[in-house]
Amino acid sequence: MSLLAQLDQKIAANGGLIVSCQPIPDSPLDKPEIVAAMALAAEQAGAVAIRIEGVANLQATRAVVSVPIIGIVKRDLEDSPVRITAYIEDVDALAQAGADIIAIDGTDRPRPVPVETLLARIHHHGLLAMTDCSTPEDGLACQKLGAEIIGTTLSGYTTPETPEEPDLALVKTLSEAGCRVIAEGRYNTPAQAADAMRHGAWAVTVGSAITRLEHICQWYNTAMKKAVL
């Protein structure tokens, strides 16, 4: 049975939650063994897949979880706004570390390596390709290039202002166009994740609301301060 077919079964049984275990850089939680522990806890709680950034984190996580891992490498480049898995060597390193799915930036922006080249390299390793997109045009273009999974990950992050709410309209548009959509980006409540599924998402990735303790504490502190002012 193919990995996609296996995921279809898991999603039907468990609801389609993917947990992104990406601590804030230099956080006390930003250690491979802690990332792996969070991933294992997420798997035991019913997550159908895990999203991991960085080769060391992926290696540590691969050793303890059996669910599929979506791997990425983030870089801050001087000559490109693209941050997610921008180079062939990133794809190769993630494949060697044990990723099942490799996600790349799928936006139409200046980049060191074309999207189609990165997709071909992912498929060369026999892995599934996911593209993190920001618009319907991004997603449809990446689908035509052969990406098996389209993420709404970058919606709101390629514009001057980032909205507070997730982009359900993008999920719906891409789903209705025949894309296998992972809704991602600002899904901070169970209700928002459920809305994404109702809008046609194949699965939903949740990160900050589950694995970034600093963000969760900030949300509570902000709300509680407002209540007493």
UniProtKB/Swiss-Prot annotation:
Enzyme Commission number, as recorded: 5.1.3.9
Keywords: Carbohydrate metabolism, Isomerase
UniProt keyword Ligase present: no
InterPro entries with a match to the protein in the record: Aldolase_TIM, NanE, RibuloseP-bd_barrel
Role summary: Converts N-acetylmannosamine-6-phosphate (ManNAc-6-P) to N-acetylglucosamine-6-phosphate (GlcNAc-6-P).
UniProt family annotation: Belongs to the NanE family.
HAMAP family reported in the protein's UniProt record: ManNAc6P_epimer
Protein name in UniProt: Putative N-acetylmannosamine-6-phosphate 2-epimerase
